[in-house]
Design a protein with these regions (language model features):
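Active-site metal-coordination/substrate-binding segment of hydrolases
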Residues: 67-162, 167, 187
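N-terminal capping segment at the start of a domain
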Residues: 2-28, 130, 316, 376-377
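A non-catalytic alpha/beta surface segment that caps or lines the substrate-entry region
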Residues: 22-70, 74-76, 80
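Short, conserved micro-motifs enriched in small and acidic residues
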Residues: 28, 134-146, 226-234, 381-388
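Short glycine-aspartate micro-motif
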Residues: 72-76, 188-192, 212, 365-367
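Metal-dependent amide/peptide-bond hydrolase catalytic core
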Residues: 233-403
Length: 403
């Protein structure tokens, strides 16, 4: 079965994770895909494939004769998607021999524009898959799942060492590795397939933290509010304006970190803001935290102690701190790309993958592309050729590790 056929089947199973849930997984619907993947793995000969109580799918492919001593290589993708634009199953548009121009997304009024996504011109002549403008596509990360499954199918008859496969829940809400069992997985090195263009070999992620800021106002009748009222919503706005506006994500790129306001609620009586803080440099992230703490201190001095409370929690670290000690893993991936006629691309991840956390748990795990682009919204798209090339690259990675 072709990777694209699998992909279309998987995106028909909705799996949005839920950041407001404390369950594991956060959404029961993730089990729907997990059970299907276990059945498919078993049908492909992965007899020990199973899904555990926390919705992690594991499977192992024994080495071919004579390759028993080669390192076990793991392949990982995540089953959940973001919850935005996920109220219905995707209705993908298939555009054969794409002309490199703007693409109207169904009747939604949205247009996939080359000016917004300049790489589109490089996809001319390929089979382009887009949304109809009303949902996500689900390429993040069901294209990765489809590619891994196709690799498993095509491994038959090819010399290879031990191969471990895992599909995780809740990656999109930062919990993809919470209950991941590296002992069950059993790999020495691994790769997540969770990137964009084919040929990506990524080993740098953000350092990350999250901040929640709560504000307590003093709500009195506005007719007698002079020198008494403290409007929590306005204090929240004041706090946000005290932060460096140049560090908002819409103004940053490459190695530039950001402070991103993700949620806000408020009234005169109380208000709440939520932020994510990101930077590839640990010291720069610390400076962003310090800027928030200083703003909080000044507002409490201005409006009275206890007017606002700031809680910052670290989330994950830059996996480059670990992967710098395993250059051979990235070099194998780059060599595989070149062998498959693709120039390897190593750009910093402006986010993270499950591999960022797993690397700090003793499982070096860089990230590979999937052939998809513009994740998390209705402009998501990918190409059949990109997916097929990623299957070829991963097979070559496994072949090289088996030498």
């Amino acid at each position: 079965m072709k990777g694209m056929e699998r992909f279309f089947r998987y995106i028909g199973i909705l799996t949005p994770s839920d950041e407001n849930s404390q369950n594991h997984p956060s959404s029961a619907c993730e089990f729907n895909l997990a059970h299907e993947l276990v059945k498919e793995l078993q049908a492909l000969g992965v007899s020990d494939a199973f899904v555990d109580e926390n919705c992690y799918v594991y499977g192992h492919i024994p080495p071919t004769p004579g390759k028993e001593e080669r390192p076990a290589i793991g392949l990982i993708a995540h089953m959940d998607t973001v919850s935005d634009f996920c109220d219905a199953a995707p209705n993908p548009q298939i555009i054969e021999n794409y002309d490199g121009r703007d693409v109207p997304l169904g009747t939604s009024g949205r247009v996939l524009r080359v000016t917004d996504f300049p790489h589109l011109s490089q996809l001319k002549g390929r089979t382009l898959i887009t949304t109809d403008g009303t949902t996500i596509l689900g390429s993040d990360d069901k294209s990765g799942i489809a590619e891994i499954m196709t690799v498993v199918e095509q491994l038959d008859g090819m010399p290879h060492g031990p191969v471990s496969v895992a599909f995780t829940p809740d990656e999109e809400i930062g919990r993809g590795t919470d209950d991941f069992r590296t002992d069950v997985f059993g790999a020495k090195y691994a790769f997540t397939l969770d990137g964009e263009a084919e040929g990506e070999v990524q080993y740098e992620s953000f350092n990350a933290a999250g901040a929640e800021v709560s504000f307590r106002g003093n709500n009195v009748h506005p007719g007698s509010a002079k020198n008494v009222m403290v409007n929590a919503a306005l204090v929240a706005m004041e706090f946000n304006e005290m932060l460096n506006s140049a560090q908002r994500p819409e103004y940053t790129e490459n190695y530039q970190g950001f402070v991103h306001l993700t949620d806000m609620t408020g009234s005169v009586a109380d208000a709440r803001l939520k932020y994510i803080l990101r930077d590839h440099d640990r010291n720069m992230l610390a400076a962003k935290k310090a800027g928030m703490e200083l703003a909080a201190q000044r507002l409490n001095e201005k409006y009275g102690a206890g007017t606002m409370e700031l809680v910052i929690q670290d989330q994950y670290q830059n996996m480059a701190e670990i992967l710098k000690d395993y250059p051979e893993v990235m070099e194998v991936a780059r060599k595989a790309c070149r062998s498959c006629g693709v120039s390897p691309i190593s750009v910093p991840i402006r986010g993270a993958t499950d591999g960022a956390i797993l690397s700090f748990r003793g499982l070096p795990c860089p990230n590979l592309g999937t052939g998809g682009y513009a994740f998390h919204g209705p402009y998501e798209h990918l190409t059949v050729e990109g997916m097929d090339k990623m299957v070829e690259i991963v097979l070559e990675i496994l072949r090289i590790f088996a030498e």
